[in-house]
Amino acid sequence: MNQKRFLLSSVSIAVLTLIGQSQAMAQATATDTPAQAVTQEIQQVVVTGTAMARGTRKIDTAFSITTATEEQLKMASPSSTADILKLVPGVYAESTGGQSGANVEVRGFPSGSDSPFVSVQLNGNPIYPVPVLSFFEGTSAFRLDDTIERVEVLRGGPSTIYSVGQPGATMNFILKKGEDTPERTIRLTGGTGDLRRVDVFLGGKLADGWYGTVGGFARQTHGVRDPQFLADDGKQITGTLTRKLDGGEITVYARLTDDKNAFYTGVPLISSNNGRTISSFPGFDPLTGTLMSNELRHFTIDAAPGKTLERDLADGRGMKAGVVGADYEQKIGGWDVSNKANYFKGDLNTISMFTGNNPVTAAAYLAAANASYNPLANAASGSMTYVRGGAVDPNQQVVQAGLWSVEKELRSFTDELRISKEIVPNHTLTVGGYYANYKSNDEWYLGNSHLMTATPNASLINVTLTNGTIVARNGVDGNVFAAPVAAYKGHNTALFLADEWKISEQLRVDAGARREKQTIEASIANQVTGDTDNNPLTVYNNGTTYATNTYTSLSRDDSVNSFTLGGIYKLAKDASVFVRANTGHTFISFDDLRNAGTQAAVNDRNGVPTPKVTQYEVGYKTAGQFYSAYVNAFFTKFTGIAFQQITTNAVLNSVSGSRGHGVEFELAVRPITNLQVTLSGDWQNSEYRDNPAIAGNDVQRQPKLQFRLTPSYRIPLGDTALGATDLKLYGTYTHIGERWADQANLSYLPSYKTFDIGALATLGSNWEVRVSATNLTNELGLTEGNSRLTGAQSSGPINARPIFGRAVEASLLYRF
């Protein structure tokens, strides 16, 4: 960490000298003209999924890839890193949990939660090489700010043979690098939830052949759902240093992030019409409400006999981490050589509320408690009082929610080397290797149920029965049911080979293969159950699960082969068709070792299989002055994926596969000057296979149809005292189709739609004002049912997670 601080300090000092430079240098304009934007789209080069570091023109790639510039990212007003994926066809991101902890589904791949089929990269290297662990998914390790030039999101394609070998989506963020023309900006943002944010970026030339940047953000907000404390509170700094070489360059970069983010799960709602109709729960605004409150914020975990832990909900699903890396590319004697390496270390903890049973009246809760604990001493009734004092009305709706603590310390080192050469005319061969070493130290406490009012910013409730049984004390009415403490480590090595054959000026074919081996190990504390206070009448902590000082060691080795074959035929200079087939794999993870429990179970490849995916796609690409189109059809076949569902009191596991097909599209028309209308989205149909219990059911959480329609219009306003001024107006209509919240297809999630709007005023070359609003009409849409309950949840009071209500932001940017 000291090395990273030294690097950032060095870069910062160097770049800050740019501020004092006295020479007059041209400033970049705030936004490109429509003609410039079209030219940039046609000529845009992508580096994700390409064999050589210098990349390939997007329209000439034989795979499906979505790109977004800095301006396109700002127009999208993403609420989190995962929310950026709403721009990507074939991907559905449930980003309603806040900054972290998203569920992301890709192309009908069967995933129950988190984001196992999305890898997040920075400058082409994975931030953490394992895309998902329990209570960690890749987007949680990244925060967007003004140091990012663009993002590229590759779906399928040749990604199965490069980098981590991700068969799903690869999300690659490209950092800005210093250029001859300096860029110096400061941006102030305010908005809903008392948002206060400042972004700063400085970049430019330091000396002959040397370039640097430094930037970052600081931000505080109570959020759209105000928990009565800061929902997001953090800061980040990023620096780069680039050295130009003969025929190439090397860039080193470092990023430090310290961010606390509240994590949102379900809220009380009313379901009717077999789950087709969702309405507000009495007294609870589903768009802005949360059960979290100052009363719940600081809580205690009865972890083991004689052991209690103090936790703070304000810590949420945040991150305190750093990444340092190097990106080298150079042409040496006819050989193209590139190497990307990074080291990541950080704490990505989850101190959060997870909703449990659906709301009931206080009287119904008390009756159930009497029935459950009657054998202890013939309980006949009892009392329910608020922790802060006062009796609870028997008709008061109450709900249970677990206050969980999951601490994860992650470390990793990754490196990828590629060497390319045209070995014979029109044949370019690429050979390379990939290495990753990674660790995770975990300490979990799941359960810890609390009884509270089903109201915004809930109040805690105590329950005591007439026989002396204490059902809930300080709101705690449930024990810790899972407490794994474990140290994990693993490493992957891979070799890959790719060949590109230019058959003619119109036809190009490529093929590649990858051989990869993974070794993972775990040392997991054995668990026992007991009464933490030796008092049978304090039933809330009876049967508490806790770790012992004895450990079980588990390990597994796996080797897989992956392939890709594709081709592209140019119909014209800026139009082409392509085909692609690939076979890829995802390895089992640390969690699979823990869930298996014994070495014999780990060794059972039927019970703990190595997932395999086969994909086929065919597509068409074109771009021009008046229109652009990127359209592809795909087919996927998935086998052998293990599922885990953490309920209110247990962990459920199963193994399944799936098949799916669909169409993805990104279309744009520019019928007149300054007007553009884009339409992007996908239609897909995916079903479970291989598991008789759910075979034929729709893959959970994924809409059959989703799309975004975005018109934008630029209005030149002429010269003003500040210089050339224009106004851009834009908006987005989003449709998300119906889905099932569970594998059994019993919990229905209705379709929903949202409207977003925005305006950007460019005032000369120095000033920029932007105003945006998301979910303008306060649509009530669900992204998740109660994932900690099984079975039908179709009528009456339920817990589910809606999208955020209307949020408005305004920002002022100054270039200096």
Task: Show where each model-derived region lies.
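Acidic/polar loop-and-plug regions of large Gram-negative outer-membrane beta-barrel proteins
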Residues: 242-244, 249-323, 351-405, 458-488, ...
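N-terminal periplasmic accessory domains that precede
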Residues: 81-84, 103-105, 121, 138-141, ...
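Membrane-embedded beta-barrel scaffold of Gram-negative outer-membrane proteins
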Residues: 336-342, 570, 576-586, 607-663, ...
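C-terminal beta-signal and adjacent terminal beta-strands/loops
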Residues: 734-742, 759-816
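Transmembrane beta-barrel wall of Gram-negative outer-membrane proteins
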Residues: 183-185, 190-294, 316-331, 514
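Gram-negative outer-membrane beta-barrel transporters
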Residues: 628, 633-638, 642, 653-743, ...
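Short acidic/polar hinge/loop motifs at secondary-structure boundaries
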Residues: 126-155
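Extracytoplasmic beta-strand/coil segments of soluble accessory domains associated
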Residues: 32-34, 50, 82-126
